[in-house]
UniProtKB/Swiss-Prot annotation:
Pfam families: Ribosomal_L34 (PF00468)
Protein name stated in the entry: Large ribosomal subunit protein bL34
Family to which the UniProt record says this protein belongs: Belongs to the bacterial ribosomal protein bL34 family.
UniProt cross-references to PROSITE patterns, sorted A to Z: RIBOSOMAL_L34 (PS00784)
Gene Ontology CC: ribonucleoprotein complex; ribosome
Keyword Mitochondrion applies: no
Biological process, per Gene Ontology: translation
Single GO MF descriptor: structural constituent of ribosome
Length: 44
């Protein structure tokens, strides 16, 4: 059986990257929440 996680930098950036997060209202909310919490890594 093939495992579900097949890492790819391109796919990772395109689905979870900072720019993608900033595109939608919900994504911006995620970034805002992570900033408020004090996360060092805001996206990916």
């Amino acid at each position: 059986m093939k495992r579900t996680y097949q890492p790819s930098v391109v796919r990772r950036k395109r689905t979870h990257g900072f720019l993608v997060r900033m595109k939608t209202r919900g994504g911006r909310a995620v970034i805002r929440a992570r900033r408020a919490k004090g996360r060092h890594r805001l996206a990916v």
